[in-house]
Regions:
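Helix-turn-helix
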Residues: 3-6, 10-48, 52
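N-terminal intrinsically disordered/low-complexity leader segments
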Residues: 1-2, 179
């Protein structure tokens, strides 16, 4: 029998690949190789399941990636780079794109996207403050860098996304007047 978390992770993977329209119970049971009985052991209905998939995105996935960046307490730029690297490796950027589309149709997804943005913006703003930027400027730089990531999701080429992010980060971490 699959665990509740197995179902949620499978749903997030399907959401990332197929979008919200492709997230169906029949496809999930086929992917996991189980019957619907396993599903109903963990969730009362599909609506409850969708709420759990949405909640897990910010509560576990995004926070987990942020927590991993702090291992060994690296310098601020390394923390930001780790966040980008880990987000690429575990497909968080792609899932974020799917979550943003879903958020236009479902309040649960909208709430979790907003929560994940707050987590990421707080993380980035702290990194910029640690680089010596005043809080207001650090918050602005954090928002710009997050916007760069959201915009780069439309770039289908992973190398292009990485270059775009690297160039933006170089500009944003440079002291004022040094770009």
């Amino acid at each position: 029998m699959q665990s509740r978390k197995d179902w949620i992770l499978a749903g997030q993977d399907m959401l990332r690949k197929e979008g919200i329209a492709g997230l169906k119970l029949s496809a999930l049971t086929a992917t996991l190789g189980v019957s619907t009985g396993s599903f109903y052991h963990h969730f009362a209905d599909f609506e409850q399941y969708l709420g759990a998939v949405a909640e897990f995105f910010s509560a576990d996935r995004v926070q987990g990636v942020i927590d991993q960046t702090m291992i060994d307490n690296p310098d601020p730029v390394t923390r930001i780079r780790r966040l980008a690297k880990l987000s690429l490796e575990d497909h968080t950027f792609e899932l974020d794109a799917a979550m943003r589309i879903w958020a236009t149709m479902d309040e649960r997804a909208a709430v979790t996207v907003e929560r994940s943005e707050r987590l990421v913006l707080g993380f980035l703003a702290q990194a910029f403050e640690d680089l010596g930027f005043a809080p207001a400027e650090a918050a602005l730089r954090a928002r710009i860098l997050l916007s760069v990531n959201i915009a780069s999701l439309r770039t289908s080429n992973e190398k292009g996304r990485r270059n775009y992010f690297r160039q933006a980060l170089e500009v944003l971490v440079a002291p004022v007047g040094k770009v």
